[in-house]
């Protein structure tokens, strides 16, 4: 084949593959078999290897995933990706309509109704029709660059179809997993001994936030647009027209979307799908109602965190009944023994549920729940399955009381009561160690990708790891002794463990699992004391001087820090090279200290603190003369009074957002 013939064949293969991708993933109407498709794809791969000069960014082969990234770059949203205000009743929807009509001085307003997909909000930037960047929503102002991962999603066109294409358009929508694919993924993970995803949203978010996009490529993800950000050279006029244009460009559109000539028609849409949501193939937790006329959007405007032209109605939590077959006892990293109900599998809000926590033995007594009972189940916040009651009228007399274990169900050691909680007091209990290791490897702590529950189980059971520090002493050869871990996976896990040594001090502190030290408290302690040595020498007065740390918490922290085992572990981690001092990040806010008070509307105070820290600034927990800016939200506390007395610079949320956006953009 000549070079010119190869070029023509490559172009034709791309056209064919993208056409069949569109038929399969967008229209759900394939014209060829999987085998025929694979044959075309393999031919394209072969030709592009022979003639790499003809590879283009929009080639179907570029979906398979880029080399693993060390971390995600940040992306500033030129048009903020705002969240939506929620409504839980029809009256709240009617009140929204009243506000809209009053602001527009209109008797009737046309709306557009869409399902609120339950996945991960992402943004796709196209320049002259070519997909050039994809990012997560993040805090609405700054997200993460996940372009390589989003390229693997077949319902995201790498190049827009048709001729009506603006120079720049930013498409926003939801990346999600179909319910059938979520079930299949969890079945596969269960067979491999991997931890299961709690729901399709977590599965989608976890897949897109993979540093290795080849993993994302293995997951069956979909994308549907719902809005736009930056647009140049085009006016869509209505939400309905915008989505129609997206369809013409090659995106998959929800066929159930409907235009409503009045709020009553919108309510009919809500009522129908509240009753029929189980028929949907994708996860949806509500309905979004938007003013259809885009000209009205500018008139209605936005608040700091949500548009005034749209509202999200949240479906009420679904309840189901099922049989409680048995109760098992789990031991957590702090030794608390939790009763867990094993259930006859039941589909609840689109996910199969076969177990639910009973929290503690006080709850067991209050519910009077017994083995063999028919129990009432719902998903708290659409995430955690929770038993809310018992169908006592369905009892047969064969039900059995649930008795607390007299010894630890894992190590057989002694137990003791701590209020409503039963605890194993054996500090060498393998279950506690496994819990500590899981916590250490978690995203908010050391974020060790690949160190999941099944690997930790094997590391502990095989005696390879007896404390957290032992993780950093493992070799690739040690990891190769684990079941089902091949050379490539073992090498990658080893590298991920070693790479975690670079995590900042506050995450090490959080990862230690000190009782009552959550992520926020760990950040405050790291900021206040600056090093592990200073913290180990802290006094009660020093701890309680930090806002949010009371006497009980301070006593618990001091007691934990005085433990010989904690001292020994910290010494080992120091020797192994983990960070035990707070580092200052280079950035435009370096040298500036911020304090937040009151409720922020655009993001949580935690997200605001992360934003400041990512730009090199510091966040203090209390007001002092060393503070440069006090950011005031709604209902500020005593910090505002103190700041005024000290004559500090006080700014509102809007000024803060302008400041960080300006600094982030340089």
From Swiss-Prot:
Which reaction is catalysed here? NAD(+) + (deoxyribonucleotide)n-3'-hydroxyl + 5'-phospho-(deoxyribonucleotide)m = (deoxyribonucleotide)n+m + AMP + beta-nicotinamide D-nucleotide
Name the enzyme's class: ligase
- Any single Gene Ontology cellular-component annotation: cytosol
Stretches assigned to the BRCT domain: 584-666
| Residues at the active site | 116
Entry-linked InterPro entries: BRCT_dom (IPR001357), BRCT_dom_sf (IPR036420), DisA/LigA_HHH (IPR041663), DNA_ligase (IPR001679), DNA_ligase_AS (IPR018239), DNA_ligase_CS (IPR033136), DNAligase_adenylation (IPR013839), DNAligase_N (IPR013840)
**What residues does Zn(2+) bind to?**
408, 411, 424, 429
Assigned EC number: 6.5.1.2
Binding sites annotated in the UniProt record for NAD(+)? 34-38, 83-84, 114, 137, 174, 290, 314
Q: Which Gene3D superfamilies match?
A: 5' to 3' exonuclease, C-terminal subdomain (1.10.150.20), 6.20.10.30, BRCT domain (3.40.50.10190), DNA ligase/mRNA capping enzyme (3.30.470.30), Helix hairpin bin (1.10.287.610), Nucleic acid-binding proteins (2.40.50.140)
The GO terms describing molecular function are: DNA binding; DNA ligase (NAD+) activity; metal ion binding
Q: Which CDD domains match?
A: BRCT_DNA_ligase_like, LIGANc
Keywords annotated in UniProt: DNA damage, DNA repair, DNA replication, Ligase, Magnesium, Manganese, Metal-binding, NAD, Zinc
Highest taxon listed in the record's lineage:
Bacteria
One matching Pfam family is BRCT
This protein's cofactor list reads: Mg(2+); Mn(2+)
**Annotated GO biological process:** DNA repair; DNA replication
The record's function comment reads: DNA ligase that catalyzes the formation of phosphodiester linkages between 5'-phosphoryl and 3'-hydroxyl groups in double-stranded DNA using NAD as a coenzyme and as the energy source for the reaction. It is essential for DNA replication and repair of damaged DNA.
Into which family does the record put it? Belongs to the NAD-dependent DNA ligase family. LigA subfamily.
Q: What is the official name of this protein in its record?
A: DNA ligase
Organism source for this protein? Coprothermobacter proteolyticus (strain ATCC 35245 / DSM 5265 / OCM 4 / BT)
Gene designation: ligA
